[in-house]
Amino acid sequence: MKQSSPTYLKHHFLIAMPHMADPNFAQTVTYLVEHNEQGAMGLVINRPSGLNLAEVLEQLKPDALPPARCQHIDIYNGGPVQTDRGFVLHPSGLSYQSTLELGELAMSTSQDVLFAIAAGTGPEKSLISLGYAGWEAGQLEAELSDNAWLTCPADPAILFDLPPEERLSAAAARLGVNLSLLTAQAGHA
């Protein structure tokens, strides 16, 4: 019998199935930053936290007044792990103190990217989140086999150009799926 190598889903969207019971992930779309034999890490991209960049910058530098445009830059709930830690997804090409290149995208985790965005010298498009979603080795694969998620290749246009309330249905539409027509019952043939 031929052994097949595992399929990893780095740079894919995880689309929560309608029956997802976990409140951290119900009705979410998650961008997978990393997925390998050791586990997976992703950022939920359609859950605004209610915070904006101005509020975050006020905490980082209480003595400086953030530019007014920062009040219109949303901060997202990236997931339930390390919710005090910031992650910025942006197109590749710009590098900061702590930037991980992900192909056509990059993820920066240092404060300098936030100050660059505030100053208007940072990436033109970005998604700023607090926290991340993490899976131990084999955990995501088990959830996939339980039909908890749909997957599709990530699309930066969905990530950066659509309002958050449209991202879930747009990601599902890439697969030709209308989530409102799916049943909560799952099975295997």
From Swiss-Prot:
Gene3D superfamilies: VC0467-like (3.40.1740.10). Belongs to the UPF0301 (AlgH) family. InterPro entries: AlgH-like. It comes from Pseudomonas aeruginosa (strain ATCC 15692 / DSM 22644 / CIP 104116 / JCM 14847 / LMG 12228 / 1C / PRS 101 / PAO1). One of its GO terms (cellular component) is cytosol. The gene is algH. This is UPF0301 protein AlgH. It comes from the Bacteria.
